[in-house]
Amino acid sequence: MDLLLIEKTLVALFAAIIGAILISKLRGKKFKLPPGPIPVPIFGNWLQVGDDLNHRNLTDLAKRFGEILLLRMGQRNLVVVSSPELAKEVLHTQGVEFGSRTRNVVFDIFTGKGQDMVFTVYGEHWRKMRRIMTVPFFTNKVVQQYRYGWEAEAAAVVDDVKKNPAAATEGIVIRRRLQLMMYNNMFRIMFDRRFESEDDPLFLKLKALNGERSRLAQSFEYNYGDFIPILRPFLRNYLKLCKEVKDKRIQLFKDYFVDERKKIGSTKKMDNNQLKCAIDHILEAKEKGEINEDNVLYIVENINVAAIETTLWSIEWGIAELVNHPEIQAKLRHELDTKLGPGVQITEPDVQNLPYLQAVVKETLRLRMAIPLLVPHMNLHDAKLGGFDIPAESKILVNAWWLANNPDQWKKPEEFRPERFLEEEAKVEANGNDFRYLPFGVGRRSCPGIILALPILGITIGRLVQNFELLPPPGQSKIDTDEKGGQFSLHILKHSTIVAKPRSF
């Protein structure tokens, strides 16, 4: 950084300190704010709590300050909610007031400042985008149209693992093959396309760019420059890299998928009775003037991240827990063999008749919640919550992981025990009917992908357990399940090697 930039930063820092002191005095008189650590001018609580605002660190703060707390992160107010009652207020009772989204400097780049659906502010644009995306992606008709493809992709995973001699001996990193499966599941829906193998050059390019996008967006490393604008010059290279990755991804989506589908549509007109893939519906909305070309591309951006990665993380967590709990794996296999018959492959309609499989999926989503803080909410205007004033444009985090892992609310929550969803928690569902358990959120800004994720999880985990005995690699009694948290993500730190011994029927 050159000398002039350093001088400008120091001058801005001095001016901001004076301004922050004056503003804090004025605001202190106006608001009854939630409890939290005492902030200092400019930096707020950043020097005390740091950049790593993962679900476990926020849980520790909630134990100190209560079910609602306020962190002043530089110029941003961050409100953390850690009780079912307050979660209901944010997500349901005051769903309109807290229904907007806050973005940071990196997500502004990757979403075109909210031209997508997931990160746009609450209002007419969000309602329009939600409506346009619901029909081609998030209905039972879509499930019935594409479930045969999901079953075929799961069968292909089983076949490929069986063909790999290393799988039954030293083991393989099965996640790599499951990643291809998830891309094919979603690209069938989006573009009526699939990739033939893990070595497909286009798949490799897409996977690499999506992976880099996730790494950059989910990192805590850039928080300081987002929280404290006067430090943003230090992020210049980071933000430049984000823009480069974003531009490459958007261009790839356009050149290889959206424009290709446009060509098919222009040469082969489809009537309303023919099955269309999702992008056909979205392009129709563009032709009607409801959305623009950028909106189309950012919808594709959302699906590449939200639908593919989160479901893949959950599959990986579920397999890891079954490997580390062989008695649960055996019990699940017994249910599949008994109810379907040995060797009879599970299909989507079977999932609803397999209560223990459903319990395994629910327990995976409880203990290893892929989005443990949900996607952040925001109130556009001053609001009230839990008897406290919440200043306008506060970032609201619901610690959904703690709601589902609080020992005051759950029996031995640290244990992976699917039986809880057949016994004391038998009435709890993943759709948000109980505010202690919100793996997909609830209300206006809940994740609509639940309708796709649950059957894909059931089919995939079911097929693997039916066809293989899943074990740790030789010399290990368990596989590593250390976590890696992100801005609001939770996935397994190390992609484990797993032995998959084929069963004989």
UniProtKB/Swiss-Prot annotation:
Effect of R368F: Reduces catalytic activity 2-fold and cinnamate binding affinity 1.5-fold
Record's note on what induces expression: By light, wounding, infection, exposure to xenobiotics and fungal elicitor. Induced by magnesium chloride, aminopyrine, phenobarbital and clofibrate (at protein level).
Membrane topology value: Single-pass membrane protein
Subcellular location: Membrane
Binding residue positions for (E)-cinnamate: R213, S214, R215, L216, A217, Q218, A306
Catalytic activity: (E)-cinnamate + reduced [NADPH--hemoprotein reductase] + O2 = (E)-4-coumarate + oxidized [NADPH--hemoprotein reductase] + H2O + H(+)
Pathway(s) where this gene product acts: Phenylpropanoid metabolism; trans-4-coumarate biosynthesis; trans-4-coumarate from trans-cinnamate: step 1/1
Effect of R101M: Reduces catalytic activity 500-fold
Protein name: Trans-cinnamate 4-monooxygenase
Organism: Helianthus tuberosus
